[in-house]
Structure formats: structure tokens, C-alpha cells
């Protein structure tokens, strides 16, 4: 039985969001094809995802110097403890499905905060004399992204930084399989928007059967 993290970063649901509609089609298809797998939905707009701030750095510093966890301040314990939970959960999973829109050439800031929370030495990667090495070498990941314009090719291709960033992080973590399911052009060509959405949902259903 595999454990799948279904990680969504959108304030809207599948009724108004192209990425969320595509994501729902994918994960429903996946569940149907893999009824024994465990799927955990992490809604980044509802979950507590601490930012790496002064409390976190202070707590980490104290722990590294030998201070016990219970001796940290209440804020330090809450934030550091939650970051530990998130990074442990991520390392223990087998598959990751990220769902985001393309906002200002990237993804919503809650996704950056989440990726920061799971980028932990000793869990998702480790430092060696030859440089950092990813530890998640038996995982696989998929990014479902909706883009109102066209960024797969053409003059805007170099401006897309959301899908590329997640790919860079998965590579850094050692994840050997990373794919994208991209929905694009629905704002650029509103007369084709419904067909674009239907095509994306159909692709998502097929992808969910074999992920």
C-alpha cells in the first residue's frame, strides 16, 4: 500500500479553479484504481505551515547547541514542532501530487512555505563531502498546474518558474520521477476554455490510472 500526499495550493475549489478541477479528476481516478492506497489531502490554505522566521531559527539554534525541546519558548516549540511533523510526513510518503495555479509566473506563496518546510537535511537530503545528495530516491511526483496563458513554448516559456521550481526541488530531494500535467491557454483563448478544461480532465483521469 502506497501513501500519497495530495498537496493543493489554491484558495478556490474545483468549481472555479482549472487546476483544482484537474487535480480532483486525477486524484479521484487514482483512488478508484488504487483503492488500498492511503491518500492524504494537504490543503495549504487551511493547514498550519509555519514560515521559517526568527522563532524557527532561534529554536533550531538552541536545539543544535544542546537545549532540550521542552526548554524552547512556546512559539519556538509550536513552530519547530510543526515543521518536524510536516517534514516527517513528507519523507514517509511514497508519492506526491502538487496542484497549483500559475500566479505571477510562479505558484502561490503557501507552496514555497511548504517546500521550505520539507527541505530538511537528514530527511529529504543530506550533506556530503561531494555536496548535497537527495534521500527520497524511491518516490515519484506529479505537478498539476493551470496557466491562463501559454508558457510551454513561445516568448513566455522562459518566464514560467512554478513548475520548474518544483522540478528543481524534487531533483534536489533525489526524487527520480517528476512529471507535469499542464493546463494552459484558457484565459488567452476564452472561446476554447471549456474544451481546454474538458481535455485536461480527460488527461487527468487517464494519468490517475497509472501513477
Swiss-Prot record:
Indicate yes or no for the key word Ribosomal protein: no
Show the InterPro entries listed in the entry: Flavodoxin_fold, Flavoprotein-like_sf, FMN-dep_NADH:Q_OxRdtase_AzoR1, NADH:quinone_OxRdtase_FMN_depd
Q: Which residues bind FMN?
A: 17-19
Q: What chemistry does it catalyse, as a reaction equation?
A: 2 a quinone + NADH + H(+) = 2 a 1,4-benzosemiquinone + NAD(+); N,N-dimethyl-1,4-phenylenediamine + anthranilate + 2 NAD(+) = 2-(4-dimethylaminophenyl)diazenylbenzoate + 2 NADH + 2 H(+)
- Which keywords label this protein? Flavoprotein, FMN, NAD, Oxidoreductase
Cofactor info, note text: Binds 1 FMN per subunit.
**Enzyme Commission number(s):** 1.6.5.-, 1.7.1.17
Gene Ontology MF term list: electron transfer activity; FMN binding; oxidoreductase activity, acting on NAD(P)H as acceptor; oxidoreductase activity, acting on NAD(P)H, quinone or similar compound as acceptor
Q: Which domain of life is it from?
A: Bacteria
> Cofactor(s) for this protein?
FMN
Q: How does it assemble?
A: Homodimer.
Q: Which family does it belong to?
A: Belongs to the azoreductase type 1 family.
Q: Which HAMAP family match?
A: Azoreductase_type1
Q: What does this protein's UniProt record list under function?
A: Quinone reductase that provides resistance to thiol-specific stress caused by electrophilic quinones. Also exhibits azoreductase activity. Catalyzes the reductive cleavage of the azo bond in aromatic azo compounds to the corresponding amines.
Q: What is this protein called?
A: FMN-dependent NADH:quinone oxidoreductase
Organism annotation: Bacillus velezensis (strain DSM 23117 / BGSC 10A6 / LMG 26770 / FZB42) (Bacillus amyloliquefaciens subsp. plantarum)
Amino acid at each position: 500500500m502506497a501513501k500519497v500526499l495530495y498537496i493543493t495550493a489554491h484558495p478556490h475549489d474545483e468549481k472555479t479553479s482549472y487546476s483544482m478541477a484537474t487535480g480532483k479528476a486525477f486524484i479521484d481516478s487514482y483512488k478508484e484504481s488504487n483503492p488500498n492506497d492511503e491518500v492524504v489531502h494537504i490543503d495549504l490554505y487551511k493547514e498550519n505551515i509555519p514560515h521559517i522566521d526568527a522563532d524557527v531559527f532561534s529554536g533550531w539554534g538552541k536545539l543544535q547547541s544542546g537545549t532540550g525541546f521542552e526548554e524552547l519558548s512556546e512559539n519556538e516549540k509550536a513552530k519547530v514542532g510543526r515543521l518536524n511533523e510536516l517534514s516527517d510526513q513528507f519523507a514517509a510518503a511514497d508519492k506526491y501530487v502538487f496542484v497549483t495555479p500559475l500566479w505571477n509566473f510562479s505558484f502561490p506563496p503557501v507552496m514555497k512555505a511548504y517546500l521550505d518546510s520539507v527541505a530538511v537535511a537528514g530527511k529529504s537530503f543530506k550533506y556530503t563531502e561531494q555536496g548535497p545528495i537527495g534521500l527520497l530516491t524511491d518516490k515519484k511526483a506529479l505537478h498539476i498546474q493551470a496557466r491562463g496563458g501559454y508558457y510551454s513554448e513561445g516568448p513566455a516559456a522562459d518566464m514560467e518558474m512554478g513548475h520548474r521550481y518544483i522540478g528543481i526541488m524534487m531533483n534536489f530531494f533525489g526524487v527520480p520521477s517528476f512529471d507535469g500535467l499542464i493546463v494552459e491557454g484558457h484565459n488567452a483563448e476564452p472561446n476554447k476554455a471549456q474544451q481546454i478544461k474538458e481535455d485536461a480532465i480527460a488527461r487527468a483521469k487517464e494519468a490517475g490510472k497509472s501513477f
